[in-house]
Amino acid sequence: MPPCSDDDVWAVTEFAEAELGDARRTQRLIALATVLAQRPGASLPEACGDDAMLKAAYRFFDNVALEPQDLLDSHIGATFPRLATVPLVLAVQDTTELDWTAHPATTGLGPLGHSAHRGLLVHTTLAFTPERVPLGILAQQVWARDPDDIGKRATRKQRPIAEKESQKWLTSVEAALAARRACPQTRFVSVGDREADVYDVLAVERPAGVDLLIRAAWDRCVTHAERYVWATVAAQPVEATATIQVPRRGAQPPRTAPLAVRWCPLTLCPPRHRKRERLRPVPLWAVHAREEAPPAGTDPIEWLLLTTCAVHTVAEALERLDWYACRWGVEVWHRILKSGCRIEARQLATAERLQRCVPLYSVIAWRIFYATMLSRAVPEAPCTVLLELEEWQALYCAIHRMPTPPPEPPSLRQAVHWIARLGGFLGRRGDGEPGATVLWKGFQQLTALTTMYCIMRPALPKRRKYG
């Protein structure tokens, strides 16, 4: 995004430590990140701007010496210092499908949920503060499903977890453990949806400072009189009422949902089909919340959460629900990746090239999301926490139609609202805070404005070129 600053360019911060076997490859990664972030929704030819950069981009994604994880490791390392500044991080993991069915010539893709569709699966762990600010990506797994695995559901109980897609949840928990080792003063909670309700995940060994929060999918056996999870929780009295904000979903508008809340400790029995392994029971806490009177035509919100975090008070129960509500942030990030960065429109001919492309655009999508949420969490902070000097100066001059910016930067909230205006945000009384869509459009406009600002003010430092 910063097109002309010599120092602290965001792409340098996130990718400078990438170990790609040759310093020139790292420089190329930084150059690509900078260029693609300026126009995240544009095609590669449009974003690159000239034949030399376009050819370099294609060569980069075609380089078999580069592993997708190599491209992400530097960003993960840059994320750790951000994690170390907060007491609690929610490591939210989720899977999405990237569908390239519209590009049938692409080789190496696998089947998706709809058997006729082809694409890649992406399982990502995003680090959030409880205030919903995404601090970075902790882990990402990208793969094409093997067509031979289709139809093996009947044998899933006979196969170890390492041979199933469920391993992705354990891999992401391991990423939270690694983050804890790097940031020993920060507490981590790994958050997963119903697909993460796997015994091996719930029973994983964890050090102090790393916990689990998983939405229940199965009515598992427990060591209590009611015998099963749901019956045990249903036997508890309603102890509190919670209110959560439900985001927009398709044609359904956002709404506020009141939930009846109950909780209790319980102990899960090991799976019966694994008796020979002599697995141990798993002590957990359950928090149940249900929307008793949803709007007509709307399914009620109902969560049964299993957690290793103790729940003794109303405040603790409500806190666990609030943590799980943070999971919707991953869905927002998925939308930015797909709609804002148009990752499914990338035409690179092979799945292997796409697997190198996804991590780069994932970090670009995170950057857009970070700007959106940071301005809501710390609105009065100076905008320099996000923007380079020339960016906020160009933004100010463009919005106010003035040739000279003030000596002091505006607040982060004010700057983000101005960027959103560039993307079509009207800022009317009932519009609320700008969202990711208008911001990614606004950032593209800001790039052009800043470039012109640097050209028209020759005294400013010139843009450093990478690669």
Please identify what each model-predicted range represents.
Residues 1-106, 114-121, 126-467:
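Single, function-defining residue in the core of a domain
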